[in-house]
């Protein structure tokens, strides 16, 4: 029986709390604040989305055998860089914030770091001044994994890093928390030492040439015969 494996983000930004704390006031200070799935109904229950509390539906999918979630991350994006860009009054970051959104990357050059504004991974900062040290990475990740278990009722044993983007030290961080395997790209991005590595097969020929269907089917056949 085929069961889906959604890689699950356990928390996200609390836009209301951050706004109330002055992140858009131009005061030069902004602290990242979180909404967790295990103790709140999440951001989708709030404006502008207002989709209601979806937690029971998510867990029903697991209870009925539709999917078996595993850990993806705590935020998906670089929260330290995001909060700093808000604090400095960056127009694009504030524009997305007002819409209840973050972003992946845009081309404004940061004068101090000589990096372009990019917040696309929680583990490896594109803007190096915001990179978490080893102790921070461990605490950040282990707290996220505990939140995953609090919501789903079991510990995650497999992960896929956001955007398959993180340093090799993440292998030890995950292994110390009991994670045994990682999914990454076939070319090697996102695979980690010390874990069982599972290269991901892209199953969307729309992104490739028409030959991709043949490649997908051939790969599937080889895997089935192993």
Describe each region flagged by the PLM.
Residues 1-158, 164-198, 214-225:
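Catalytic alpha-helical scaffold of carbohydrate-active enzymes acting on polysaccharides/glycoconjugates
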Residues 203-212:
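A recognition module on extended beta-rich or small alphabeta surfaces enriched in W/G with H and D/E
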